[in-house]
Swiss-Prot record:
It comes from Haemophilus influenzae (strain ATCC 51907 / DSM 11121 / KW20 / Rd). Residues 23-42 bind DNA. The gene is metR. Gene3D superfamilies: Periplasmic binding protein-like II (3.40.190.10), Winged helix-like DNA-binding domain superfamily/Winged helix DNA-binding domain (1.10.10.10). This is HTH-type transcriptional regulator MetR. The keyword Transcription applies. One of its GO terms (biological process) is methionine biosynthetic process. It holds the Pfam family HTH_1.
Length: 309
């Protein structure tokens, strides 16, 4: 039997290119340098004597040969993942409990689709969200009131394992008729005379406060709301400005309710991590949920970046 050239890693690379539309972003997704990924693609093209995508296209446009390999990857990858799940069930069983605690008001936008996909493969795992917003989800883990937590910072605790989910950009939003809509980039001083609409959380959990305003001694007037849609309504009505994840703002940007602007020249970026108890490290369904959340997030949320520990 003639040996095949294509390997599983090639298919992962091609899917990353398809989903990100960029060589640099795809390289980060599969944990390669950009030159290593380009070399991998070059070897595939040389093997078959065909280009896989059009050079200098943005986003990448795949050739017919490239699209054929993408179809192959879409067929093979789910089967490999299913086989790995089956083996995990044989080893560890397929029942358990997975209670999720979050410290992020916008997490539900991407968490629910991941939970739905997970249920299809782990029907005997009791899946639930610990009700309410939590300022100490790690404490819930350690007290056995939660089994999986989403946090924005890593704590040093030998009893907890942290795994990177992704990094994302926070953008400033305001009414289309607001004076700040004329600025491409907002700096700390732009918030001085504004009403800042936030979620009702402690200051140290607000990225804009921690990373931009606090060091400048700027503390604008506040207004709080639990709901993102209520925040959008206040901003659209010129009763304040806000900072939220780009993915959370996008549906309202597309409808023209508000406009989004970059916060500082460097941008305002935040991170999210998954946390589990050290004693639960071997539970296969927890690892599969982690992989499902990452996969769903990068597939559906715009503007994410790979995050490393």
């Amino acid at each position: 039997m003639k040996p095949t050239f294509l390997e599983f890693r090639h298919l992962k690379t091609l899917l990353a290119l398809k989903e990100t539309g960029s060589v640099s972003l795809a390289a980060k997704r599969v944990y390669l340098t950009q030159s290593a990924l380009s070399h991998q693609i070059k070897l595939i093209e040389e093997q078959f004597g065909l280009p896989l995508f059009e050079r200098k296209s943005n986003p990448l446009r795949f050739t017919s040969a490239g699209e054929r390999l993408i179809r192959l990857a879409n067929e093979v990858m789910p089967k490999v993942i299913d086989a790995e799940r089956d083996l995990a069930r044989v080893k560890h069983g397929d029942a358990g409990q997975l209670r999720i605690a979050v410290e992020c008001h916008t997490c539900f936008d991407w968490l629910m689709p991941a939970m739905d996909e997970f249920r299809q493969h782990w029907g005997l795992v009791e899946l639930d969200i610990v009700s309410g917003f939590h300022t100490d989800p790690v404490g819930l883990l350690l007290s056995h009131r939660a089994d999986w937590a989403i946090v924005s910072e890593i704590e040093h605790n030998d009893d907890v394992i942290f795994k990177p989910l992704f990094s994302y950009e926070m953008v400033g939003i305001c009414s289309k008729n607001h004076s700040l809509a004329e600025k491409d980039i907002w700096e700390a001083e732009d918030f001085i005379d504004e009403t800042w609409v936030t979620y009702p959380v402690p200051d140290d959990m607000l990225d804009l406060w921690r990373k931009v305003l606090k060091s400048k001694g700027i503390n604008p007037t506040r207004r709080t709301t639990e709901l993102t849609i209520a925040m959008i309504q206040l901003v659209a009505s010129r009763r304040g400005i806000a900072t939220i994840p780009y993915w959370a703002a996008l549906p309202y940007l597309e409808k023209g309710y508000v406009v989004a602007r970059k916060v500082t020249k460097e941008g305002l970026y935040s991170n999210l991590y998954a946390a589990i108890r050290k004693e639960d490290e071997s539970l296969s369904y927890l690892e599969d949920f982690y992989q499902t959340v990452k996969s769903q997030s990068f597939s559906t949320l715009p503007g994410l970046s790979v995050l490393n520990l």
